[in-house]
Amino acid sequence: VCGTSSQTLDYTLELFIRALENQKPKVVILETDAIYREVPSQKAIFTRLANHLAVFRYHNRWKTLSWNDFLGETHFTWTDDWKGYRYYATISGTNPGEYMKPVETAAEIPERNIRYVKEIQRLCQENGARLVFLSAPSPVNWNYARHNGIQALAQEMGCEYLDLNLK
């Protein structure tokens, strides 16, 4: 499992490339909400640069370096608030019919995001993995038009698609 809250596809691709260095998954499940999450041009460029030049990823780290960082024992003290979870015990159900009313239209997927998804699929194929699209239940972020958009993309790419928002 490799995911973070509000993850964009540029970061998904970066994490997937890193995972493939040590792992050989048989199935890769891509949560579809990210496919509709806009990746701003500036962020896409920065992510690509950070993959190739560590100075962009760790550009402020030099300010806090000490000799102990080079010579001492490694202490992993940094945490990323986007990774992990927040325990939340409240349960509030919903009626799927309220937000998943069938429509004929399909929500448009940003072209840049389609390119990211196709790159993920290419890496899956090269590494013997099957790409599966999954829409987790989400009455706030999901609707039938988005379902139709992902369904069309899945058919075009030959991917399996599971939408848990449907009855």
Annotated model-derived regions:
Residues 6-10, 109-111, 139-146:
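Acidic-and-aromatic substrate-binding clefts and catalytic sites of carbohydrate-active enzymes
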Residues 13-19, 119, 146-149:
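A short acidic, amphipathic alpha-helical/loop segment
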Residues 32, 38-130:
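Secreted/periplasmic serine-hydrolase-like ester/acetyl group-modifying domain
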Residues 2-4, 31-33, 134-137, 164-167:
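Active-site-proximal beta-strand/loop segments in catalytic clefts of secreted hydrolases
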Residues 24-27, 125-132, 157-160:
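Loop/turn elements at helix/coil->beta-strand transitions in domains of secreted/extracellular proteins
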Residues 1-59:
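Membrane-embedded segments
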Residues 148-149, 155-167:
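C-terminal regions of proteins
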Residues 19, 123-124, 153:
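Hydrophobic helix-cap positions at the C-terminus of alpha-helices
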